[in-house]
């Protein structure tokens, strides 16, 4: 439904879902394959804001707009993808407030959890072993936070697990991308003193080119990265929890969870490994991994809809 016309009221109906007054009863939950569209409007809105801030920085040379450009540009695709998962949640039982809370607090908490794990295992070069370690550590860091948020929910579902996982992953991706986009700025100021000592002037246009490239490339690849990897972990936790009929920390070592959790770990490791150098000029490996992860997500969405049908038949 992306290319169909939609009213403001339709968008508002999606954004107000999940409250005590707006959560539908199980009998009214749709069992049809979801047709999300609002995420595309969110994407266009953020893209327009980014374009305007880009003009301020690149056309008019106003540095005051640079922080906004970095933040808006880095958040555009992760947030839009998160909204898509919100639309896919047929239960309509998770509010926008909860989603934003999970995005902000969960995203930042997953960064802290990941850094804590790295402080234990140490950082590695991104060779094959280093990529595997990175995949395990970062996906485990996100999974722990996803588990915590899911443990606070009254009703667990596969589609809800996908949404909570995607929200944590989107926060992780957005803040990480903003950090990468900031690196050229830090390098610029670090080098400016060196250049000044030799009476030379540093060209700021190279810095801006590097920032723009980082934002655009990471945004382009974001749908196949942290958002969907964490979404799979969220669904895996719910599937394992329903099989065990409990939701506690034992899930994190349960074979049902680990069988699915290994998928984002492998995809993440492959993404960071030297294998990514194959066809790097056209981002062949990341694009191929994106296709694979979305096939897995589609399978999980189908499982979630089958769960909806089972539950509604019992009502």
Could you tell me what each predicted segment is?
Residues 1-315:
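Hydrophobic alpha-helical segments at protein termini of multi-pass membrane proteins
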């Amino acid at each position: 439904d992306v290319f169909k016309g939609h009213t403001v009221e339709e968008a508002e109906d999606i954004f107000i879902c999940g409250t005590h007054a707006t959560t539908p009863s199980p009998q009214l939950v749709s069992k049809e394959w979801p047709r999300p569209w609002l995420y595309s409007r969110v994407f266009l809105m953020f893209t327009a804001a980014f374009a305007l801030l880009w003009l301020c920085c690149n056309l008019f040379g106003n540095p005051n707009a640079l922080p906004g450009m970095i933040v808006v540009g880095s958040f555009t695709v992760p947030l839009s993808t998160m909204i898509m998962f919100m639309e896919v949640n047929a239960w309509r039982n998770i509010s926008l407030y909860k989603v934003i809370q999970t995005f902000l607090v969960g995203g930042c908490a997953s960064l802290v959890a990941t850094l804590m794990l790295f402080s234990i295992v140490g950082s590695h070069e991104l060779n094959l072993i280093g990529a595997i370690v990175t995949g395990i550590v970062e996906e485990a860091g996100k999974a722990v936070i996803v588990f915590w948020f899911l443990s606070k929910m009254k009703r667990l579902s596969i589609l809800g697990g996908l949404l909570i996982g995607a929200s944590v992953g989107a926060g992780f991706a957005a803040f990480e991308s903003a950090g990468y986009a900031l690196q050229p700025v830090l390098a610029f100021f670090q080098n400016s003193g060196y250049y000044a000592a030799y009476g030379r002037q540093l060209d700021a246009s190279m810095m801006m080119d590097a920032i723009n490239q980082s934002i655009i490339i990471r945004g382009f690849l974001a749908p196949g990265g942290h958002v969907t990897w964490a979404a799979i972990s969220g669904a895996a936790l719910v599937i394992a929890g329903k099989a065990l009929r409990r939701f506690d920390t034992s899930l994190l070592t349960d074979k049902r969870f680990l069988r699915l959790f290994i998928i984002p770990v492998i995809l993440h490791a492959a993404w960071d490994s030297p294998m990514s150098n194959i066809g790097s000029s056209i981002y062949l490996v990341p694009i191929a991994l994106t296709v694979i992860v979305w096939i897995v997500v589609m399978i999980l969405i189908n499982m979630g809809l089958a769960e909806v049908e089972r539950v509604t038949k019992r009502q």
